[in-house]
UniProtKB/Swiss-Prot annotation:
Catalytic activity: a quinone + NADH + 5 H(+)(in) = a quinol + NAD(+) + 4 H(+)(out)
Name this polypeptide is given: NADH-quinone oxidoreductase subunit B
GO MF terms, alphabetically ordered: 4 iron, 4 sulfur cluster binding; iron ion binding; NADH dehydrogenase (ubiquinone) activity; NADH:ubiquinone reductase (non-electrogenic) activity; quinone binding
PROSITE patterns given in the database record: COMPLEX1_20K
HAMAP family: NDH1_NuoB (MF_01356)
Family: Belongs to the complex I 20 kDa subunit family.
Role description: NDH-1 shuttles electrons from NADH, via FMN and iron-sulfur (Fe-S) centers, to quinones in the respiratory chain. The immediate electron acceptor for the enzyme in this species is believed to be ubiquinone. Couples the redox reaction to proton translocation (for every two electrons transferred, four hydrogen ions are translocated across the cytoplasmic membrane), and thus conserves the redox energy in a proton gradient.
Membrane topology designation: Peripheral membrane protein
Protein's organism: Cronobacter sakazakii (strain ATCC BAA-894) (Enterobacter sakazakii)
Amino acid sequence: MDYTLTRIDPDGENDRYPLQKQEIVTDPLEQHVHRSVYMGKLEHALHDMVNWGRKNSLWPYNFGLSCCYVEMVTSFTAVHDVARFGAEVLRASPRQADFMVVAGTPFTKMAPVIQRLYDQMLEPKWVISMGACANSGGMYDIYSVVQGVDKFLPVDVYIPGCPPRPEAYMQALMLLQESIGKERRPLSWVVGDQGVYRANMQSERERKRGERIAVTNLRTPDEI
């Protein structure tokens, strides 16, 4: 079997994943200005209600590649209880899953399989890259490892660490829920371009920059 990879350019034309590229549609908040007060508020309320249901019933695709998957499964235990976020229903079929967690090392031979499974997922769908190997290849800078899942899949949330703790995975779920809550998708069936609006979410590093700079007393490692 011949394995091929399709590299993604998020800023260019994307025929393979047209719904996952950076959307060029108008900001829905600006569109409300040109509508009546009643219809604008009604549509806004419907979007909020649909997004609330989506973000609180995220079903993950049971797909692990390496040691990061062990940390992901740990979040399902009673200590962490990821069921609080509505994401405890593991799916064995991509057609029943809402988002895929690529937890582990994406080998070149496995990349086409990951891509095919992602294509089998139904819209709306999201991707979480978990761990240094999935983010950038990690310590495996070799021919057999893809240097980042975002080389062939659109990634919504990155989780740093080698491996990241279960708390990091749950924080990624919360960030994904926050992003889903700001999305705007068609409320009915649409053929062709659906005009999905995704908010430009700020990275955690930039969001907490002011908080880090304001720290005056640094704690020792045994106090953290």
